């Protein structure tokens, strides 16, 4: 049986919020089976609970943000991506600010935190969301699609018309029947352009952004002295974001995801399109030996409980 997972112990981190630029304290705690991922704004009186839920997504400008009863928590996608990549189902996330810390701009530090806490299996079957028929969402030349697949595969293509990006791979397929989240995806950083900084900061965005937590480009080149972590780091970060955005549905997907020029908004819309068509999905568990698709077994063998 493929079981649900949570943390063995509590782990803490401190960092800076990407958009607000203020210090943020983060605490990750174990949670009971079938809890899901729940964010807690512990700086509010009374504290506010914000469960991971695609219908709570309120802000998709440059990140995925959740809102409930007027309380918000932003930039959840990198942590959600790491949680999905390591197969963690149940987690309490305490945060004392309106956004999570950006850390190094990838999911790598969150993977380290989760692995440092230890991951343990629970006495409940993992509940997958299996896509039964194709669904699609389009806006102009941007689109995203989910199709039936016996595993989890993501294909993404980007168009930026920038020399630093164009000389890298601008399309990628990550199939977890073959690839490792930790090795192949987790370290891809968010990216931005110097020409956009003044405009973003005028709108209260990217106040905490720096070369320490993003790939930054001028008109021609990458400004980070250490260069890129992957030859296709730009499009790989889009895959990283998509994994986190999709995990807001509350379950690991059995699906093939494909997207062109998509972002947080389209990822949220495709989840809503899927969930609102009850004939397009079902909940699946693998409780008997031999029932588990090989792709699923491989994915969680590469991210074992510790």
Curated annotation (Swiss-Prot):
GO terms, molecular function: metal ion binding; UDP-3-O-acyl-N-acetylglucosamine deacetylase activity
Cystine crosslinks: none
**Cofactors demanded by this protein:** Zn(2+)
Q: What are the annotated GO cellular component locations? A: membrane
GO biological process terms, alphabetically, are: lipid A biosynthetic process
Q: Which residues form the active site?
A: 264 (proton donor)
Catalytic activity annotation: a UDP-3-O-[(3R)-3-hydroxyacyl]-N-acetyl-alpha-D-glucosamine + H2O = a UDP-3-O-[(3R)-3-hydroxyacyl]-alpha-D-glucosamine + acetate
> How would you classify this enzyme at the top EC level?
hydrolase
Instruction: Give the record's pathway.
Output: Glycolipid biosynthesis; lipid IV(A) biosynthesis; lipid IV(A) from (3R)-3-hydroxytetradecanoyl-[acyl-carrier-protein] and UDP-N-acetyl-alpha-D-glucosamine: step 2/6
Protein keywords: Hydrolase, Lipid A biosynthesis, Lipid biosynthesis, Lipid metabolism, Metal-binding, Zinc
> For Zn(2+), which residues are the binding ones?
78, 237, 241
Q: Give its E.C. classification number.
A: 3.5.1.108
InterPro entries in the record: Ribosomal_Su5_D2-typ_SF, UDP-acyl_GlcNac_deAcase, UDP-acyl_GlcNac_deAcase_C, UDP-acyl_N-AcGlcN_deAcase_N
Q: Which SUPFAM superfamilies match?
A: Ribosomal protein S5 domain 2-like (SSF54211)
Q: Cite the Pfam families for this sequence.
A: LpxC
Report the family membership.
Belongs to the LpxC family.
Function according to Swiss-Prot or TrEMBL: Catalyzes the hydrolysis of UDP-3-O-myristoyl-N-acetylglucosamine to form UDP-3-O-myristoylglucosamine and acetate, the committed step in lipid A biosynthesis.
Question: What is this protein called in UniProt?
Answer: UDP-3-O-acyl-N-acetylglucosamine deacetylase
Taxonomic source organism:
Aromatoleum aromaticum (strain DSM 19018 / LMG 30748 / EbN1) (Azoarcus sp. (strain EbN1))
Recorded name of the encoding gene? lpxC
